């Protein structure tokens, strides 16, 4: 028989949000409750819309698209907990906006892996809403080939076909 005597946490560990994080959570909850919540998501789904562009503009104005972007690139420079607070409230309301793909997938990848040139170019555009980011995910079962991956690029947008592109 094996016995373990592990002390995982000390008695002084506080896992609560800070006062600032609680304030952010309350403000986000009020914001998403006011902006329509589930009824707004249903409207977008029922009308086959791409998303709620007005809601996305308001999220941009609040600066939440730059919540994790360093201040040097025009973001708020906050941490992952603040990002999670916003993401949790956004998910609770089923807000039909490209927050997950653009803010915590694409933007995080640029922050972590982008060159200084790419960061300087893209991060301010992601914060301001001038750009929305996502990426095409490579699948083991369906590798990208000329037959299942097409793309065209204009000065305004990228258009194409690819399996598994978030948002």
Where in this protein do the model-derived segments appear?
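Conserved beta-strand segments that form the floor/walls of ligand-binding pockets within enzyme
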Residues: 16, 68, 105, 136, ...
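Fold-independent oxyanion-binding glycine-rich loops
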Residues: 27, 35, 89-90, 103, ...
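Amphipathic, small/basic residue-rich leader segments at the start of a protein or domain
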Residues: 2-100, 121, 125
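N-terminal glycine-rich flavin-associated loop
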Residues: 95-117
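Short, solvent-exposed polar/charged micro-motifs at secondary-structure junctions
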Residues: 51-53, 107, 111, 143-148
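Glycine-rich, Trp-frequent "lid" loop and neighboring beta-strands that shape
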Residues: 75-76, 117-167
């Amino acid at each position: 028989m094996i016995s373990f005597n592990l002390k995982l946490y000390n008695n002084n560990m506080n896992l609560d949000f800070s006062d600032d994080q609680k304030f952010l959570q309350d403000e986000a909850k009020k914001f998403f409750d006011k902006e329509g919540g589930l009824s707004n998501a249903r409207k977008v789904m029922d009308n086959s819309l791409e998303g709620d562009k007005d809601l996305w503009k308001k999220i941009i104005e609040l600066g939440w698209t730059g919540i994790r972007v360093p201040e040097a690139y025009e973001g708020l420079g906050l941490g992952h907990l603040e990002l999670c607070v916003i993401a949790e409230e956004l998910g609770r309301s089923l807000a039909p906006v490209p927050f997950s793909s653009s803010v915590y997938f694409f933007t995080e990848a640029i922050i972590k892996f982008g060159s200084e040139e790419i960061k300087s170019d893209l991060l301010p555009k992601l914060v301001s809403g001038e750009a929305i980011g996502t990426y095409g995910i490579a699948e083991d079962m369906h590798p990208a080939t000329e037959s299942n991956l097409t793309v065209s690029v204009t000065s305004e947008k990228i258009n194409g076909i690819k399996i598994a592109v978030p948002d």
